[in-house]
Amino acid sequence: RLGVGIGWNHVEYEALGENFSNRGRRSEEQVKLLRELWTKDVVDFTGRYHRVNHAGINPRPIQQTIPIWFGGGADRVVRRIGEQGDGWFPQFQPDSEGQERIAMMRQFAKDAGRDPMAIGIEGRIPFGDGDPDIWNKAAAAWDEAGATHLSVNTMRAGLQGPDQHIEAIRKFKEAISG
C-alpha cells in the first residue's frame, strides 16, 4: 500500500516553490493520475495541476491496483478518503468523536457510490509504558470502531536504538494476539 499525506508545514512547500493552500486538491488529482499510469499502457491526462500527453510507465506495477491509504482527519481529508481512498491512517482515538469521523467517511464513500466497508482503517496504539492490558483495551476499542489493521507507535516510549523498538513491537504483537 501507498500512504499519502499532504503535510502541515508550509515551509516544505515554499522550499519547493509550491502553493501550500492547494495541496489537497493537487493530491486528489495526483491519485487519479497515478491510478491511470499504473493501469494503462498509454495515458492522456489533463488536469488543473498536471498534464501527461501520450505517456506511460514501464514496467507497470505487478499489483493491480496499489492500495492508496490517506492519513489525517480534517473534514476534507475524510471526504477524500471516502471518495478515493483504499484505507485510512486516522489521527484520532476510537472514542465517540473518532467513531463520528469514521461514520462521516463511510457516508462520503456511499455518496460516491463506493462500498464503505471496503475502505481499511488502521488504528494506532501508543506503546506507552508497555502495559498489555492498556493495549488490549485499545485494540478492542479499535475493533469496535471498525479498524481493519492495528499498529503500535513506539516513538516517545523511552526506547533506545532499533533493537529495543523491535523488541517492543514483538511484545505488543504477542500481547494482542493472545
Language model features with spans:
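Active-site-adjacent structural elements that line small-molecule/cofactor binding pockets in enzymes
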Residues: 1-178
